[in-house]
Curated annotation (Swiss-Prot):
This is RNA pyrophosphohydrolase. Belongs to the Nudix hydrolase family. RppH subfamily. Accelerates the degradation of transcripts by removing pyrophosphate from the 5'-end of triphosphorylated RNA, leading to a more labile monophosphorylated state that can stimulate subsequent ribonuclease cleavage. Residues 13-166 form the Nudix hydrolase domain. It comes from Mesorhizobium japonicum (strain LMG 29417 / CECT 9101 / MAFF 303099) (Mesorhizobium loti (strain MAFF 303099)). It comes from the Bacteria.
Length: 173
């Protein structure tokens, strides 16, 4: 029987990441339906809708990372920056995923959020496959009202989405 090593979350760092709220001309927010991989933070949940997000590469500024991640995950380039959340927002993985998700290297994520306006049309959005040979993260997408977002995400990220909605709610009007 294989031995499992107990991981102490307090010894693990947060993964530095960016999150992106993309609003269309009607004030609706782009969300993608995640492809849930085994041993990911989405395994076993039905709440798989989320906004684009991703890691910050070494030497990369958060805004650069946001623009890169947006293109890698959605193909979108026709965007303009609207706002940056004032603070970094952290979340912790649930206990059963610590030591498993994120290859066991992180306790959760520390995210810097940006809001962008999308000026293109739906034909620009490419998720499966996304551009540049990247692995697909989403299998479908939708424009949703901002206030619905916290109910669409995995429960342990709900607080993050509540904070993001609070930071950017003025943009939906």
């Amino acid at each position: 029987m294989p031995k499992t090593k107990k991981v102490d979350r307090e010894t693990l760092p947060y993964r530095p990441c960016v999150g992106l709220m993309i609003l269309n001309g009607e004030g609706l927010v782009w969300v993608g339906h995640r492809i849930a991989e085994p041993d990911s933070e989405f395994a076993g949940t039905t709440q798989l809708w989320q906004m684009p997000q991703g890691g910050i590469d070494k030497g990369e500024e958060p805004l650069q990372a946001a623009e890169r991640e947006l293109y890698e995950e959605t193909g979108m380039r026709s965007v303009s920056l609207l706002a940056e959340a004032p603070d970094w927002i952290n979340y912790d993985l649930p206990d059963h995923l610590v030591g498993i998700a994120f290859k066991g290297r992180y306790r959760g994520q520390m995210q810097k959020w940006f809001a962008f306006r999308f000026h293109g049309d739906g034909s620009e959005i490419q998720i499966n496959p996304p551009p540049g040979g990247h692995t697909a993260e989403f299998d479908k997408w939708s424009w949703r009202p901002m206030q619905d977002l916290p109910d669409l995400i995995v429960p342990f990220k709900r607080k993050v989405y509540e904070e993001v909605v609070a930071a950017f709610s003025h943009l939906a009007r």
